[in-house]
C-alpha cells in the first residue's frame, strides 16, 4: 500500500467511478438545500467533451476528482470532490493545485469557480487559496432547491 496520491487525467472509463465519488462527496453537504444526486454518469461523460476531470488515486482507488474547463483566457473548475472518509488529509488541496496547473498549461490567466451561497464555509476556504469574490450569478432554474440560493463567483489570477 502506498501513502502517495497520484493525479492523472480521467478517461471515459472512469465516468462511473467519478459519478459515484461526486455523489458521495456532495450528499451530506448539500442535502439540506437540494435532493437527489449531484450528477449523472451521462453528465460526467458530456462534461468530458468540453473539459477534463483530474482524478486522485491511491493504490488504484479513486479518492478525489476535480473538473476543469478552459474558457478562453480563463478556466473554470468545479465538482471538487474527495471521498468523505479521507477528507482533511490534503487530497483537495492537491487536486486544486493540479487544476490550477492545468489551467496554466492551457495558457489561462485566471481560474474561476462558482460556490453556492448556502455553503457558508466555502468563501473563506477559497479566499485562503487566493480566490477573490467577483460577483454573484443565478442558480440553475432547472435544479429544484429547498431553499433560495445563488452562486458566489470567485476568481484567482494564475500568472
What would you call each of these model-derived segments?
Residues 2, 48-49, 105, 128:
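Short, well-ordered coil/turn elements that cap or connect secondary structure elements
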Residues 2, 61, 145-146:
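Short, solvent-exposed loop/turn segments that connect beta-strands within catalytic domains
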Amino acid at each position: 500500500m502506498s501513502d502517495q496520491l497520484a493525479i492523472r487525467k480521467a478517461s471515459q472509463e472512469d465516468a462511473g467511478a467519478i459519478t459515484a465519488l461526486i455523489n458521495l462527496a456532495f450528499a451530506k453537504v448539500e442535502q439540506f438545500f437540494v435532493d437527489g444526486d449531484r450528477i449523472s454518469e451521462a453528465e460526467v461523460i458530456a462534461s468530458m467533451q468540453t473539459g477534463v476531470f483530474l482524478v486522485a488515486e491511491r493504490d488504484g482507488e479513486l479518492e478525489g476528482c476535480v473538473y476543469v474547463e478552459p474558457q478562453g483566457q480563463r478556466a473554470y473548475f468545479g465538482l471538487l470532490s474527495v471521498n468523505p472518509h479521507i477528507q482533511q488529509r490534503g487530497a483537495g488541496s492537491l487536486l486544486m493545485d493540479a487544476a490550477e496547473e492545468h489551467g496554466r498549461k492551457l495558457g489561462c490567466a485566471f481560474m474561476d469557480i462558482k460556490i453556492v451561497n448556502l455553503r457558508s464555509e466555502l468563501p473563506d476556504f477559497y479566499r485562503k487559496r487566493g480566490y477573490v469574490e467577483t460577483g454573484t450569478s443565478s442558480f440553475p432554474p432547472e435544479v429544484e432547491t429547498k431553499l433560495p440560493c445563488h452562486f458566489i463567483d470567485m476568481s484567482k489570477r494564475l500568472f
